[in-house]
Amino acid sequence: MMERLKIAYPVITEGKYDKIKLESLIEAHILCTDGFGIFKDTEKQAFLRRLCDKTKIIVLTDADGAGLVIRNFINSILPKERLIHLYIPQCAGKEKRKTTPAAEGFLGVEGLPPDLLRSLFAPFADNGPKNG
């Protein structure tokens, strides 16, 4: 198994399965929006604002409409200059744990190949290859 990438910035992702997948690939403080739950969770919103005062935050959501809505909401409540947006490609398929594909037919963060996710985080890793 490859060494997990050490990421200094906290990471926001959508759900617990995304978090589990990321934890297998990176060492970072990983937070979940609980899907659309972030919209009404004022405590979590306040926590994210306080966190943004101290550090930049990486945002990684699914490549579907719901992921875009969540990403835009995060953009609206946090200072844009403190956010690092990572984007996954729209890959057709279904996650192994699901019986049917998602509504839009794309894999979410949890369903993507590990190498693809590692390549997204590599530029921010303390122990990995740097791009640029």
PLM regions: where:
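A short, flexible N-terminal coil/short beta segment enriched in small residues
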Residues: 1-13
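TOPRIM fold recognition
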Residues: 5, 24, 38-132
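The start of beta-strands in P-loop NTPase/AAA+ ATPase cores
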Residues: 9, 29, 56-57
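Hydrophobic/aromatic beta-strand patches that form the interior of the parallel beta-sheet core
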Residues: 12, 31, 84-87
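Short beta-strand scaffold positions
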Residues: 13-14, 61
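Short, glycine/polar-rich helix-capping loops at beta-to-alpha or helix-loop-helix junctions
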Residues: 16-21, 44
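A short beta-strand-loop structural module common to alpha/beta enzyme folds
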Residues: 28-40
